[in-house]
From Swiss-Prot:
InterPro entries: Ribosomal_uS8, Ribosomal_uS8_CS, Ribosomal_uS8_sf. It comes from Eremothecium gossypii (strain ATCC 10895 / CBS 109.51 / FGSC 9923 / NRRL Y-1056). It comes from the Eukaryota. The keyword Ribonucleoprotein applies. The lineage of its organism: Eukaryota, Fungi, Dikarya, Ascomycota, Saccharomycotina. PANTHER family: 40S RIBOSOMAL PROTEIN S15A. The gene is RPS22A. It holds the Pfam family Ribosomal_S8. Keywords: Ribonucleoprotein, Ribosomal protein. GO terms for biological process: translation. This is Small ribosomal subunit protein uS8. GO terms for molecular function: structural constituent of ribosome. GO terms for cellular component: cytosolic small ribosomal subunit. There are two genes for S22 in A.gossypii.
């Protein structure tokens, strides 16, 4: 089976481990995008600590789960989003206002939609977490 998206596989593994009540999950392979996505999730308290393990191949990440995550997912293809259109995307993807985050990749890095609005940057939509 071919991997279409490493990020989608990682978030799927986190979702499945969270649903089964696991305390930690191993993600491999890893990438810089996955690490930045996890940093945003960690900043908002959806996951605990995570550790990158360099095995001289593609690397592994061990993520500690807190039980606070309901769902996370990838938006594919990565649509271009203007600053004014971010609100429409959050309304479509998230279950309620002020609940969850849409994660964007911008010229200023990977961040959630609120931080992108504060910095007044737009970019491509990566995924969501709530």
């Amino acid at each position: 089976m071919t991997r279409t998206s490493v990020l989608a596989d990682a978030l799927n593994a986190i979702n499945n481990a969270e649903k089964t009540g696991k305390r930690q999950v191993l993600i491999r392979p890893s990438s810089k995008v996955i690490i930045k996505f996890l940093q945003v999730m960690q900043k908002h308290g959806y996951i605990g600590e995570f550790e990158y393990i360099d095995d001289h191949r593609s690397g592994k990440i061990v993520v500690q789960l807190t039980g606070r995550l309901n769902k996370c997912g990838v938006i594919s293809p990565r649509f271009n989003v203007k600053i004014n259109d971010v609100e429409k995307w959050t309304a479509n993807l998230l279950p309620a206002r002020q609940f969850g985050y849409v994660i964007l990749t911008t010229s200023a890095g990977i961040m959630d939609h609120e931080e992108a609005h504060r910095k007044h940057v737009a970019g491509k939509i990566l995924g969501f977490v709530y």
